[in-house]
Amino acid sequence: MPRVKRGVTSQARHKKVLKAAKGYTGRNNSCFRIAKQKVEKGLQYAYRDRKNLKREMRRLWIARINAATRLHGMSYSQFMNGLNKAGIELDRKVLSELAISEPESFGTLVEQAKAAL
């Protein structure tokens, strides 16, 4: 059985990790063993924060909608309840965009929600 030398594959693997560690400071971007740990941790953070981003954006949308509805004398929960009863199915992202970019249109939505209550 011939001897298998893995120089090419290990070199490619090292190169891939060091390329991913580009931009890190100190030995974190040049020493393979340390760079491997930092890249792995970075991927863990990225995975975690992709989940957290969804939560944070939803919280932001709710805060924006709440602020806009309070200008019209209504709370967020009353507004959402009114929208559901009126049969208006807009998600929070669209509602927050409407509240910022088109306050008049948002005002009509608030009036419809009030009428449905």
UniProtKB/Swiss-Prot annotation:
GO terms for molecular function: rRNA binding; structural constituent of ribosome. Signal peptide: none annotated. One of its GO terms (cellular component) is ribonucleoprotein complex. It comes from the Bacteria. The keyword Magnesium does not apply. Keywords: Ribonucleoprotein, Ribosomal protein, RNA-binding, rRNA-binding. GO terms for biological process: ribosomal large subunit assembly; translation. Binds directly to 23S ribosomal RNA and is necessary for the in vitro assembly process of the 50S ribosomal subunit. It is not involved in the protein synthesizing functions of that subunit. Belongs to the bacterial ribosomal protein bL20 family. This is Large ribosomal subunit protein bL20.
